[in-house]
């Protein structure tokens, strides 16, 4: 392996941002791009009804509602590090897409609202990170408003999420008395002016807590800060990089993303401490990012990122080797060699053609319906990357057309949207209905909105008597045929042709499982 390849791998940081809705994740994303020089002015999310929307929220429905319902990928350069930032859906209904994004990152940044502490979505996402031992850095946001005491917030994180906290910055006051942060990582005090949308050219830095300027600037809060820091240096957990990388400890920063408080300090610590691209598991062996042979997997498909082009993009995580524009790779699921001529890198909706890319990078491959979530591409070895599941949906709707002449457009729209993983599509064995299944109900609104805006299809939903689904398998062909005959009314094929049992209740599901012990019912399914 060349020195240059190792250097390129080592300077990459690929991470996702996770939080409960409204903790300020989109604002923080904007500010990271601002400090990285990727944008000159933050998108002022509060002005979302005006013409300017947050850079990472580009779909029409997101701009109307002010929620992130798809995950964007953004690349920027900071202090000679190449950073790939994956912005995950902020609404609790989008946990499945968020999970898939977390399969493509090496670490995560958790955003917590200082007034609310740990909330339900944060807890769920943390469970996903735990399954993969993903290192987590924490940003406690909205210190410019009144909130919980900093020590109480740390205790809440430790108790609720069962992870040790190591504060690397400390707030000076909160709400109207918020003056800035003391950086324990660099032993520096940083004072900011509120309300800056553009990147500040310089910050006031005071390195000695006994500096008399501290009293001039902070007044009575100066002594409180000195007491806090003395207490922390004696009682708080010291930051241990190895424990962070194992997922046992989270370094914590305090700040106010909307006012640029504490964001750059966190970004500085992040690029120095966050992991380089990690090895990736396959069905046969672990793939090191330092290997020379090219490999990677598709973790997301997004239709119509550019409505003018009616395109579909497959988001692809490079796991090893170097990507070169125009290179020939093997698409293993379909057993074909393909040339990737026009791969793209992303800056939210802006894109650029990529000439070369390295492990940790996320590239976009144009997809005309042949690529699916979970697909593996390599230049040699037949590999299959693991850990990219679908979850059993909990909510269901039947789709009906207002105009029967639009049936082809409806079918095309539903198939493409199901391929994205935004919703699951089922076709019952005994009729021609389209049944949609989702992990959360907001997904149905998104699908209806996108059918109308992107496929010019007016449709309505009808309720159906389903409460849960399971993918079914049986090694005994005769038993499976008998099962299909007896349970036909509850059986459907999903978009990939997998047989699925749709149950009207958990009780009905349990009863059927007892009746058919040779049939296996799966709650999750790996993408083929």
UniProtKB/Swiss-Prot annotation:
GO terms for biological process: regulation of translational termination. One of its GO terms (molecular function) is translation release factor activity, codon nonspecific. Belongs to the TRAFAC class translation factor GTPase superfamily. Classic translation factor GTPase family. PrfC subfamily. Its main location: cytoplasm. The keyword Thylakoid does not apply. This is Peptide chain release factor 3. NCBIfam families: prfC, PRK00741.1, small_GTP. It comes from Syntrophotalea carbinolica (strain DSM 2380 / NBRC 103641 / GraBd1). Residues 10-278 form the tr-type G domain. The gene is prfC. Keywords: Cytoplasm, GTP-binding, Nucleotide-binding, Protein biosynthesis. Pfam families: EF-G_D2 (PF22042), GTP_EFTU (PF00009), RF3_C (PF16658).
């Amino acid at each position: 392996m060349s020195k240059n390849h190792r250097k390129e791998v080592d300077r990459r940081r690929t991470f996702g941002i996770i939080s409960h809705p409204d903790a300020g994740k989109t604002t923080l994303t904007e500010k990271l791009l601002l400090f990285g020089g990727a944008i000159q002015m933050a998108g002022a999310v509060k002005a979302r009804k005006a013409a300017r929307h947050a850079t990472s929220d580009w779909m029409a429905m997101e701009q109307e509602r002010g929620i992130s319902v798809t995950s964007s990928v953004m690349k920027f350069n900071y202090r000679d590090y190449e950073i790939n930032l994956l912005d995950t859906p902020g609404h609790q209904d989008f946990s499945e897409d968020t999970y898939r994004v977390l399969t493509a990152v090496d670490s995560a940044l958790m955003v917590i609202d200082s007034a609310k502490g740990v909330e339900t979505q944060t807890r769920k996402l943390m469970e996903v990170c735990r399954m993969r031992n993903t290192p987590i850095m924490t940003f406690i946001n909205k210190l410019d408003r009144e909130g919980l005491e900093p020590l109480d917030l740390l205790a809440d994180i430790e108790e609720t999420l069962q992870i040790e906290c190591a504060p690397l910055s400390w707030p000076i006051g909160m709400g109207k008395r918020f003056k800035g942060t003391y950086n324990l990582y660099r032993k520096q005090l940083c004072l900011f002016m509120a309300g800056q949308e553009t990147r500040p050219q310089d910050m006031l830095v005071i390195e000695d807590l006994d500096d008399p300027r501290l009293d001039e600037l902070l007044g009575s809060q100066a002594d409180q800060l000195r007491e806090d820091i003395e207490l922390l240096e004696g009682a708080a957990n010291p930051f241990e990089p190895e424990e962070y990388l194992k997922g046992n400890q989270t370094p914590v920063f305090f700040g106010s993303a909307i006012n640029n408080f504490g964001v750059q300090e966190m970004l500085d610590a992040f690029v120095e401490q966050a992991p380089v691209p990690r090895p990736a598991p396959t069905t046969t062996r672990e793939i090191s990012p330092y290997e020379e042979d090219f490999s990677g997997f598709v973790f997301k498909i997004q239709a119509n990122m550019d409505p003018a082009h009616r395109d579909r993009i497959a988001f692809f995580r490079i796991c090893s080797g170097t990507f070169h524009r125009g290179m020939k790779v093997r698409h293993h699921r379909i057993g074909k060699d393909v040339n990737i001529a026009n791969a793209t890198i992303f800056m939210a909706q802006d894109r650029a053609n990529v000439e070369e890319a390295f492990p940790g990078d996320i590239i976009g491959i144009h997809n005309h319906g042949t690529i699916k979530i979970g697909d593996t591409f390599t230049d040699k070895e037949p590999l299959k990357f693991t850990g990219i599941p679908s979850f059993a949906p909990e909510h269901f709707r039947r789709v009906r057309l207002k105009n029967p002449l639009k049936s082809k457009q409806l079918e095309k729209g539903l198939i493409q949207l199901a391929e994205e993983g935004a919703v699951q599509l089922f076709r019952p064995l005994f009729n021609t209905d389209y049944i949609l299944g989702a992990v959360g109900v907001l997904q149905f609104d998104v699908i209806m909105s996108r059918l109308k805006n992107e496929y010019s299809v007016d449709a309505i939903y009808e309720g159906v008597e389903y409460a849960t689904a399971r993918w079914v398998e049986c090694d005994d062909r005769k038993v499976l045929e008998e099962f299909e005959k007896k349970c036909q009314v509850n059986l459907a094929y999903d978009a990939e042709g997998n047989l699925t049992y749709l149950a009207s209740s958990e009780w009905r599901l349990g009863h059927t499982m007892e009746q058919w012990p040779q049939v296996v019912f799966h709650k999750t399914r790996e993408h083929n």
